[in-house]
């Protein structure tokens, strides 16, 4: 059996923009762990704006895992935040209810740059545009 570094990653409760949080645990597996082998894990939600100090337990539910190529036997574990019962999504967990909204739409945007003579189209031929230019 090999020891694996499981890096649990989740979004905290800060607004308007949540931050990424992480904590690591070491567990032994015969091979790279699969999602169903990863346990739920508790954390103190009072330090992440996801609970009050008097009742601060929250749970991390693994929803995806990927090899961490920067560490030997590392695994990145993407998590949802759940209430202490482990089944109810935390109010800051907007991902858990996304499929309940029939009007949810997602789009992808691909950006392109057009070049002429090795510079972006419209750039001056002898340098760069002014710092606050129209580009």
What are these regions (language model features)?
Residues 1-135:
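Glycine-rich, acidic/polar active-site loops that bind/position phosphate-bearing ligands
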